[in-house]
């Protein structure tokens, strides 16, 4: 009997030992889920690259439940701290609108497969949607996220480098598109449309060609310009990527401006820039989320890209600012300043009675 009790006791101890070992093994094999739920990253907590260059003004929300798969949400966010030294008043209201990471996508969401590496996750892959392809790679932990995306947008007829169209006074061809028709009886300048065309051909075109050399529409949706800041032919600078992007939709070109990137560039040169620059840029905030719609006509190696009155007239109120008028008139030859000032003086009435207004660029494929 004692032997039987001893045997049973021994078996119970052995079973308890193996059960404990089994529990320990299961405990060791269950890796805790990092960042369970949603975690948002922006500003200094986010290192985002579009192509090979940093992309500012964006926010990313990362979420996972099992630590094996996750969801990433990318969108734009406007950081008011970047313009604190540029705004003329601390009471300025800063709009919270911004374009997304990928041109034409206010919000981009995609799923990722996660690999745990210590206290962080790594992920990489390809996401295709809306005719574009995005390759991505990144890491995320409890304090920060790094993400690099390389995007190839759908092919379009604007891809490549374009020069400003050459000016031809005999045919009226000009790099600048500017036509303006108003029915106002109070116009004292003969023929508003003719005056606008004259302004474009004689003043704006020569000024523009001094500063702007070429415009390149890239496969990733970036727009890059070569220019001369001093207006010298032998001086050539290239604008940074991720300042301006574009996409084509329903026959229109949508221009997206990255306000954070632009204002960061302004802030880097703020000794040369008035506070007015930032406030003017902010007037475009209502168009930032989806982009500024522009007409785009391409034929035989030429392109006409222009805004019409539906877009321009609400923005022309900016020209009522005395500071802006002074800046523009200062660039006009002294002998023509009186005529240009007369146009600005009549601007409010012109806006009310305008039936046609087109402004933009004529380009030729390089």
Segments (PLM) and residue ranges:
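Short, hydrophobic/aromatic-rich segments at coil-to-beta transitions
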Residues: 32-42, 67-72, 116-125, 159-161, ...
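Tryptophan-anchored aromatic micro-motifs
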Residues: 30-57, 152-203, 362-365
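Short, exposed beta-strand/loop patches in secreted or surface proteins that constitute
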Residues: 58-66, 111-116, 137-140, 213-218, ...
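Bacterial Sec-dependent N-terminal signal peptides
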Residues: 1-6, 10, 14-41, 137-160, ...
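Polybasic, proline/glycine-rich intrinsically disordered low-complexity segments
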Residues: 114-153
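N-terminal glycine/threonine-rich, aromatic-flanked beta-hairpin/loop signature
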Residues: 53-107, 175-267
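Mixed-charge, low-complexity intrinsically disordered segments
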Residues: 83-97, 170-208, 256-355
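Amphipathic hydrophobic-ligand
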Residues: 50-60, 102-111, 130-136, 237-242, ...
């Amino acid at each position: 009997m004692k032997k039987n009790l001893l045997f049973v006791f021994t078996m119970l101890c052995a079973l308890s030992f193996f059960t404990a070992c089994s529990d320990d093994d299961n405990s060791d094999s269950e890796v805790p889920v990092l960042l369970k739920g949603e975690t948002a990253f922006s500003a200094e907590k986010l290192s985002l690259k579009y192509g090979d260059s940093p992309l500012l003004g964006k926010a990313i929300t990362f979420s996972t439940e099992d630590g094996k798969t996750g969801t990433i949400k990318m969108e734009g966010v406007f950081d008011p701290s970047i313009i604190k030294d540029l705004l003329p008043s601390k009471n300025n209201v800063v709009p919270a609108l911004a374009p997304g990471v990928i041109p034409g996508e206010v919000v981009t969401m995609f799923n990722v497969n996660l690999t745990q590496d210590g206290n962080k996750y790594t992920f990489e892959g390809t996401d295709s949607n809306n005719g574009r392809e995005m390759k991505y790679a990144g890491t995320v932990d409890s304090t920060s996220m790094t993400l690099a995306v390389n995007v190839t947008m759908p092919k379009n007829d604007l891809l490549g480098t374009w020069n400003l169209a050459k000016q031809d006074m005999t045919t009226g061809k000009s790099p600048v598109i500017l036509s303006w028709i108003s029915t106002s009886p109070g116009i004292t300048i003969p023929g508003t449309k003719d005056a606008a065309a004259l302004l474009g051909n004689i003043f704006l075109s020569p000024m523009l060609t001094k500063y702007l050399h070429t415009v390149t529409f890239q496969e990733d949706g970036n727009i890059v310009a070569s220019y001369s800041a001093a207006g010298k032919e032998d001086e050539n600078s290239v604008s940074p990527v991720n300042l301006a992007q574009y996409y084509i939709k329903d026959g229109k070109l949508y221009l997206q401006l990255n306000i954070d990137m632009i204002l960061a560039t302004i802030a880097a040169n703020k000794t040369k820039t008035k506070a007015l620059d930032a406030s003017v840029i902010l007037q475009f905030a209502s168009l930032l989320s989806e982009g500024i719609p522009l007409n785009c006509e391409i034929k035989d190696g030429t392109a006409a890209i222009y805004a019409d009155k539906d877009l321009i007239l609400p923005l022309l109120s900016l020209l009522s600012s005395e500071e802006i008028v002074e800046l523009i008139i200062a660039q006009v030859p002294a002998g023509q300043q009186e005529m240009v000032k007369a146009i600005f003086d009549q601007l409010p009435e012109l806006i009310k009675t305008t039936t046609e207004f087109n402004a933009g660029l004529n380009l030729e494929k390089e």
